[in-house]
């Protein structure tokens, strides 16, 4: 016969276990929040910080040059959801060269809706301040790259920076005559570009560059026009490794690496955009340099390799900043 005190002790344990199980049955609410959108790595002496601006859902009908059913089947095979459009990242890149703090592209601000506009907050979360940026380089003047130059009141987000864009893109997107020459429904992009650039221009801190120009020591502008008349990429050189920040060479990684001949509705010159993409892919695969893309899945940094008749994207692996590599 079990002694009475031991029976009480066992009963107490059962009660305690019941209370514990009851407590575990009510977990906390799901948080459903993501970590801040920044990623950092070194490319030789350059400290590169990818900044997530957010995402936009692109309808598959915007992609041209492939049958839509085949396009969706191709994306479905890669587990890329197309039901609400293809979720497409918008990235900017902050490069500390050791002498300069360079921001390539500025994100969308409020121009394309509430899923975008996170570059300034993520820049701060990464440890820098907008006031510390001294150089702003625009791959091109589409709204998802330039609207983030100004805040909601039209004031510069980067008050101490010199803003630079290619001459051909500036001559096109900042031209009132060019804006008046297009249908009224197409003028919004021109208005957004002019509004974003205006305060820098008024302050005497806007200038243009030519393809091939050395913008800073070890930083060269590359001609990658086609998507826009003056679309540019930026090659950060030095040591054994290089980084090409290529803007909108790719809009759909799930399709265009396999088939570079697929264009997008927003291309000013689709045939030239295709030729540029093929040349840039070939160069990236041949030279094995790092690539950073505005619409590649965040952080948008990696390598391009040949894969049969097409190419394949190899994204960077997350990890610590290492001095031994």
Question: Model segments located where?
Answer:
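Metallo-beta-lactamase
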Residues: 27-28, 117, 124-128, 132, ...
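Conserved beta-strand hairpin/beta-sheet module of binuclear metal-dependent hydrolase folds
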Residues: 33-126, 233-250
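Active-site metal-binding loops of divalent metal-dependent hydrolases
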Residues: 53-54, 106-109, 141, 168-169, ...
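Active-site environment of divalent metal-dependent phosphoester hydrolases
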Residues: 36, 59, 141-148, 172, ...
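Active-site metal-binding motif and surrounding structural segment of the metallo-beta-lactamase
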Residues: 91-92, 114-164
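Bacterial N-terminal signal peptides that target proteins for export
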Residues: 2-13
